[in-house]
């Protein structure tokens, strides 16, 4: 499986087998298992933009980062805005108004927040570059995954063949019904109509294609649907719009 789980201190989190051969890469994805938040944010809500009690989210973040042994002082948090803006990061900081970030520096841990939108984690294993992408339907429509990779290729003079990317837990095509108006904005190969009363959008496929078109050859899809697995993950759509958030985390130690 591209993604497997570990549990420590009652905190369950995902890891990615594709990064296991590279000990300098540290990549994780939180679940809702563990933590102190109350319904509907139970339990390990890591999202500060939710209506959850701030002190509980702060406690959850401490529990999560302590468990995966990453100091919060080394963490980069984004204020995600559903656009295609990306940022090169050299030191831990708060990023205002971005949906993608990347770094070639050790001990800088990038995060992406999600609860149905597609979280992408990636690593260029030769030049030692890591990054995250937040791709909801708006970002996907703007080709944020492709634009981010192309920006990195130009900045570092690489071709993308040594980039390994992961599509993290997010809503699957089966559960992502969209309007005809929205469906018409996407390439038809990402829209499924057969068997459904309304169109369904395949964000996994769309982001895989965008990454491939940008030269990424190694792409793994976790296969976990947040809508279907609300026992493990938060789902904005599945909860009627009131849910917690997970964090994908990637960085390097060397």
Where are these regions (language model features)?
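Active-site microenvironment for binding and transforming phosphate-containing groups
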Residues: 1-254
């Amino acid at each position: 499986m591209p993604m497997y789980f570990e549990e420590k201190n009652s905190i369950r989190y995902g890891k990615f087998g594709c990064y296991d051969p590279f000990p300098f890469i540290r990549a994780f994805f939180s679940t809702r298992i563990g933590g102190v938040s109350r319904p509907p944010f139970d339990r390990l809500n890591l999202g500060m933009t939710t209506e959850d009690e701030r002190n509980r989210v702060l406690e959850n973040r401490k529990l999560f980062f302590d468990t995966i042994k990453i100091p919060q002082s080394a963490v980069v948090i984004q204020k995600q805005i559903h656009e295609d803006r990306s940022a090169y990061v050299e030191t831990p900081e708060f990023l205002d108004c971005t949906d993608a970030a990347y770094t070639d520096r050790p001990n800088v841990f990038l995060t992406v927040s999600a609860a149905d939108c597609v979280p992408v984690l990636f690593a260029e294993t030769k030049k030692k570059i890591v990054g995250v992408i937040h791709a909801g339907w708006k970002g996907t429509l703007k080709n944020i995954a492709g634009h981010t990779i192309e920006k990195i290729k130009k900045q570092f003079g690489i071709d993308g063949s040594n980039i390994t990317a992961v599509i993290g837990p997010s809503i699957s095509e089966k559960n992502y019904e969209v309007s005809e108006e929205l469906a018409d904005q996407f390439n038809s190969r990402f829209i499924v109509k057969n068997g459904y009363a309304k169109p369904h959008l395949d964000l996994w496929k769309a982001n895989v294609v965008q990454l491939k078109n940008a030269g990424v050859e190694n792409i793994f899809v976790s296969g976990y649907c947040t809508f279907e697995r609300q026992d493990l993950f938060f789902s904005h759509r599945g909860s009627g719009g009131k849910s917690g958030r997970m964090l994908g985390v990637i960085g390097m130690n060397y």
